[in-house]
Regions:
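Radical SAM enzyme core and accessory elements
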Residues: 1-23, 47, 51-53, 68-78, ...
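Acidic, low-complexity intrinsically disordered segments
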Residues: 2-254
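Flexible glycine/acidic-rich beta-alpha junction loops that bind and position SAM and/or redox cofactors
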Residues: 29-30, 123-125, 229, 277-278, ...
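A general structural detector for well-ordered alpha-helical segments in enzyme core domains, enriched
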Residues: 42, 69, 91-102, 129, ...
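A structural motif corresponding to the C-terminal end of an alpha-helix
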Residues: 48-52, 106-107, 261, 354-369, ...
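Short acidic/polar active-site loop segments enriched in Thr and Asp
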Residues: 52, 77, 264-266, 317, ...
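Structural recognition of alpha->loop->beta junctions
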Residues: 126-147, 310-320, 386-420
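Radical SAM [4Fe-4S] cluster-binding motif and immediate context
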Residues: 188, 192-372, 377, 384-394
Length: 549
């Protein structure tokens, strides 16, 4: 008994003695606001396990710089870039190398530097040319980070690396050791906003305003994980399709904590809010009871008018729908639907009518709507009877503007936003080898897109095709500087597409219709490249003016 007590005390002392630094990278280009949830979630998980020296350094905070980070990591025992996106690799690469150099100055180069988040997908090519990053944490981190931290506290991290869940690295034999952390089946005890420093210009969402126009302090929460569908362009397409839910008790507790901190709005950052009808209604009721206005995401084919009315009655003021495209052949190429080929074909041809009906019902229900399209997708080639898929080809400009016209005229949305198809490692579109539906628009053809495509140093080292940076692509959501995108588009096509959408919006306003608002990169607005008048009508600068941004 005495031996066991002594061992427990020793472990407790070790846990309390180590310093863990969680780093959140800044996101250069954004159309939507939102917080890096990995920082508070992982910090909460570590706190619950007894770790008390955990720093959250979010580089999106205006009061933090990389110099502050370099100062804080000098006595750290574990450093983790948390919740990183693949698009952030240039920043991760730059900052991690500076951190390693700083540790070297103090003889502490053996301190593990880890990277977590979607940036770890297909990361072997970066790992092979980045010796200062110790390992990459693949999969959900709430439980695996505790095992990693325990190993660091015991002083056995390097010996235990092959056994630690989700840890990927180049081993002593020069092979890439690959593993993924198991799904977290219960996240009720985690405070998703633990120690979060609120950054209004990054976290508050302009879809949440008071009646007098005042911006509401916005929090993000997730109440479920997992998606039953496998849309190929989405990085959820290679994850588990089992949906895990947050308990009502935990949800209420966290909302009450947020209310005490002055929050008034909540964005539920989940894949399909209405995937389970009863759960969606209960969460709406709880949000209403706790005094929040809120919004979320769902699928066109997973909501009806009765649900919409119920959500609106319970303070829902925004629902995002990923329409992606209206052409049935595009839905088939993107694996939008589950089931047999015959079933998928039927669902694809029924989809446009569903889109129109749902948006009409949203307008009737008073639920603000968002119409989202992806440009440059592939489409299926069907046989004359439309019963078999014969192959795939790129969509055309005409295909895309037809989808826009359908959206503006048939759906009359409150918001309209675009994305150029980008290939994110971890999605079927990026990962699938061979002549898949995406090969006809993928810059690598039949080869997969890896994390290295997003890092200039890796692009140069491996000779990957280089994405040509074009300022006009910033008219679309989330297209950043180093990012492989569809070969189906070019700058003129993107510019012409956005111009066409603006013309339709302006024409609708002139005809007495409501304004549809585009989600536009704030930098473009600040530069005066895109303007909107008091009526909501748009004007855009000539394409040449986008060349140097």
């Amino acid at each position: 008994m005495l031996l066991a007590q002594t061992k427990t005390k020793q472990i407790s002392t070790l846990i309390n003695s180590i310093k863990i630094v969680l780093i959140g990278e800044f996101l250069k280009h954004r159309s939507f606001n939102g917080a890096n949830k990995a920082l508070p979630v992982l910090a909460s998980s570590l706190f619950n396990a007894g770790f008390r020296q955990v720093l959250q350094l979010d580089l999106e905070r205006p009061d933090l710089s990389i110099d502050d980070v370099l100062s804080d990591i000098r006595d750290a025992d574990l450093i983790i870039f948390s919740g990183c996106l693949t698009t952030q690799w240039p920043e991760i690469d730059n900052h991690s190398s500076k951190i390693f150099a700083e540790l070297q100055k103090y003889g502490r180069e053996n301190v593990p530097i880890l990277v977590g988040g979607y940036a770890t997908k297909s990361v072997e090519d970066i790992a092979r040319i980045t010796p200062w990053i110790t390992a990459y944490c693949d999969g959900e981190g709430e439980e695996s980070i505790i095992e990693i931290a325990y190993a660091v506290a015991r002083g056995t991290f390097y010996e235990e690396m092959p056994k630690l869940p989700g840890l990927c690295f180049i081993n002593s034999e020069g092979k890439f050791h690959r593993t993924i952390a198991t799904r977290v089946n219960n996240f009720d005890d985690i405070d998703q906003n633990f120690g979060l420093v609120h950054v209004p210009q990054v976290h508050d969402m302009d879809i949440f305003k008071a009646s007098d126009g005042r911006q509401l302090k916005t929090a993000q929460l997730f109440t479920q994980r997992g998606c039953p569908w496998g849309c190929g362009f989405c990085n959820k397409s290679s994850e588990s399709n089992n949906v895990i839910r947050l308990s009502e008790a935990s949800f209420k507790r966290q909302l009450q904590q947020l209310k005490q901190r002055g929050y008034e709005a909540v964005y539920l950052d989940v894949d399909t809010f209405t995937v389970h009808d009863y759960a969606a209604r209960r969460e709406a009721e709880i949000l209403h009871e706790e005094g929040f206005v809120w919004g979320s995401n769902t699928r066109i084919d997973k909501i009806n008018y009765e649900q919409m009315r119920y959500l609106v009655e319970h303070n829902c003021v925004y629902m995002f729908f990923g329409v992606e495209h209206t052409l049935p052949e595009v839905s088939l190429a993107n694996h939008k639907f589950n089931g047999s080929v015959a079933s998928q074909i039927k669902q694809a041809f029924d989809y446009p009518a569903k889109i129109a009906r749902v948006f009409q019902e949203m307008n009737q229900a008073g639920l603000p709507s968002s119409y989202f399209l992806i440009l440059g997708l592939p489409k299926a080639k069907l046989n004359p009877n439309k019963t078999e898929i014969m192959g795939y080809e790129p969509t055309t400009f005409e295909d895309d503007i037809e989808a826009i016209r359908f959206g503006i005229e048939k759906c009359n949305p409150d918001f309209l936003n675009f994305n150029v198809l980008r290939f994110m490692p971890g999605s079927m579109a990026a990962d699938t080898v061979g002549d898949c539906s995406y090969a006809c628009v993928r810059p690598s053809g039949t080869k997969p897109i890896t994390a290295g495509y997003f890092l200039p140093r890796a692009v140069n080292y491996y000779g990957y095709p280089q994405f040509q940076e074009r300022g006009v692509y910033r008219l679309c959501e989330s297209v950043s500087r180093y990012q492989p995108i569809t070969t189906a588009v070019n700058p003129q096509r993107v510019y012409d597409t956005i111009c066409y959408a603006m013309q339709l919006i302006n024409h609708k306003i002139d005809a007495g219709g409501k304004a549809t608002n585009l989600f536009i990169d704030r930098d473009l607005i600040a530069l005066g490249l895109v303007t909107q008048d008091e009526q909501g009508k748009y004007a855009i600068a000539p394409i040449e003016d986008f060349a140097n941004i």
